[in-house]
Amino acid sequence: DEVDAETLAHAGLVQYAVIFDRIFRFAITGTRVRNYDAVGGQLLFAWLHQHGVLHWTDTSLAFDWDGVAEQVIALSDKINDLYWRSIDRPKMAHWLAAYELVRSTLTPHPASVWAQGLPTEVLAGAPSGYTNAVLDDEFPLSMFFEALEKKMRPVIASTEGIRG
């Protein structure tokens, strides 16, 4: 009917909006201190790039839109499986599994204690030891995001205080 046709006409635009919002907004506008929304955007960007549906050169960003949905679903399946398995394991083991999922796509900070392997005293201790070992910027921005942030910094600064 007419409502379904209108909804379908806008569905593709919603896909673009969600992808661009997730990839760009938090990664370059937020603080780097334990900014997990930014890590989510970085993860999505890297996943799409590593699975051949996002392509970046020094001056051009392109998407293979026909393959994007399939790859977003594949990443979602990995995350859903992580959460599904969480019911069968202790919290700290789940945290380690979550870290490995992110680390399988994003490169952790070279000084990361998590990436090097948490010491036995942390592994055997309270959950606070795990969270205290996380660096403020555990997964630093990639070169793509560094270059984008540098180019966008003046634009972002010019919008400070604007409310809509």
Roles of regions detected by a PLM:
Residues 1-2, 164:
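Accessible peptide chain termini
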Residues 2-118:
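Long, well-structured alpha-helical subdomains associated
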Residues 84-164:
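Extended, compositionally biased alpha-helical segments that mediate assembly or anchoring
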